[in-house]
Design a protein with these regions (language model features):
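Extended helical coiled-coil dimerization/tether regions that scaffold
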Residues: 2, 99, 181-267
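P-loop NTPase switch/coupling surface
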Residues: 1-194, 212, 216, 230-235
Length: 268
């Protein structure tokens, strides 16, 4: 399985940070601070780093889904003069140290915006590209040679998703491929519609074409969801997928057999 954990992020002329490094824990990180202190800045800098992984795909992830540095991300500073002009500091750079691939090797790379209205570039080579191209080749063969390839989980969950589902109306017919989940995965308004439709399709195809025998992928996803809620579930409770609910197919099944969609449960 490929490991991909961000270990360090360094911001140089990125928004309000002139030169700041953050060392991250591989399991969980919590940023606390007042409004405007830079919490979201660090999260979106991590998004720029994750964009480097998506940029390594040449076939299966279109470049429009890669999160880049924007011109407005460059740090602004006021010149001490009679007219107090606001200048843009450059270059704007996000550097990263990360654990990568099955050997858990440490890699480093940086993404740079050199000038206003320019394009985000790599400060050197993308160290993930060779491995990703090998994955794409195995996927393209369509001969199960990619069976042992377990792709990294990459997802940005911004608070913007709470009031607007940016890809709710995304329409895609046919069976979703294993890389389709990377589409919109770094969007600030990313929703769960694609994931829910993938689960729904797995079950429907199993009924229609596999004599009702559930695919292993469906069982693994359901196990993973239950594992995530393990400490919160009471005896006899479990998480199920139920397509009877339009907006939310994840539901809680109580020990008495009552099925409650997640949208009916309180945030507490």
């Amino acid at each position: 399985m490929c490991e991909f954990n961000i270990q360090e992020i360094e911001l140089f002329n990125y928004r309000q940070f002139e030169d700041k490094k953050f060392v991250l824990n591989s399991r969980m990180n919590v940023f606390a601070g007042k409004n405007g202190s830079g919490k979201t800045t660090v999260l979106e800098a991590a998004n720029v780093v994750l964009g480097a992984y998506l940029a390594a795909f040449k076939t299966y992830v279109p470049s429009r889904f890669v999160f880049n540095i924007k011109s407005t991300d460059a740090r602004r500073k006021t010149q001490i003069s009679d007219d107090s002009r606001i200048l843009t500091a450059g270059p704007c750079k996000v550097s990263c140290k990360a654990a990568w691939n099955i050997d858990y090797e440490s890699i480093g790379f940086q993404r740079v915006l050199l000038k206003q209205d320019g394009r985000t570039k790599f400060g050197g080579k993308n160290p993930m590209q060779q491995t990703v191209i090998e994955w794409e080749s195995k996927i393209a063969n369509a001969d199960h040679s990619d069976e042992e390839v377990i792709l990294p989980l990459v997802l940005y969950l911004s608070s913007a998703r709470l009031w607007k589902d940016g890809n709710k109306r995304t329409v895609k017919t046919g069976v979703l491929s294993r890389t389709d989940a990377y589409s919109h995965c770094l969007d600030a308004q990313h929703g769960l519609d694609i994931a829910f439709r993938y689960i729904d399709t797995l079950k429907a195809v199993a009924v229609e074409e596999n004599d009702g025998k559930i695919f292993p992928a469906y069982e693994v996803i359901l196990w993973a969801v239950n594992e995530a809620f393990r400490d919160e579930l009471k005896s006899g409770e479990k998480i199920i997928f139920s397509t009877k609910y339009e907006d939310d197919i994840i539901a809680l099944k109580t020990s008495e057999g009552t099925v409650l969609p997640f949208q009916m449960l309180s945030d507490g």
